[in-house]
Amino acid sequence: MGPRVLQPPLLLLLLALLLAALPCGAEEASPLRPAQVTLSPPPAVTNGSQPGAPHNSTHTRPPGASGSALTRSFYVILGFCGLTALYFLIRAFRLKKPQRRRYGLLANTEDPTEMASLDSDEETVFESRNLR
């Protein structure tokens, strides 16, 4: 048997995960500039509990960043869903019912009208007469 080929959805999922992980790794490991190529002594290793430590955290994100990308995207999607629901609610309540069109005798059943036949040779025509 030949090499196993990944299914397209699984392949797309792996590609999306790699692309999502790529910016995280790019922030942490910046390329060296030509001035940094010179050898320098390694920085002193300090304990995170010492007073000079910037923060006591196990997260690798910079101190200015808040939350993970997944949390932020969840809030963005939640906001879009909320705006969509608000749009449809406003549209439903502002929707005015169309006024009934009145077609004379068909819509006006309360008027006392009488239909009388007019005799003619070709066809029978009815005349509407109001009996008020």
Swiss-Prot record:
Location, primary (coarse class): membrane
Residues bearing PTM Phosphothreonine: T113
Entry membrane topology: Single-pass type I membrane protein
Carbohydrate-modified residues: N47
Gene Ontology CC terms, in alphabetical order: cytoplasm; extracellular region; membrane
Keywords for this protein: Glycoprotein, Membrane, Phosphoprotein, Signal, Transmembrane, Transmembrane helix
Annotated segments matching region Disordered: 34-66, 113-132
Stretches with biased composition (Polar residues): 46-60
Subcellular location: Membrane
Regions that span the bilayer: 73-93
InterPro entries xref list: FAM174-like
Pfam families with a match to the protein in the record: DUF1180 (PF06679)
Cleavable signal peptide: 1-26
Modified residues (Phosphoserine): S117, S120
Family: Belongs to the FAM174 family.
Protein name: Protein FAM174C
Annotated source species: Homo sapiens
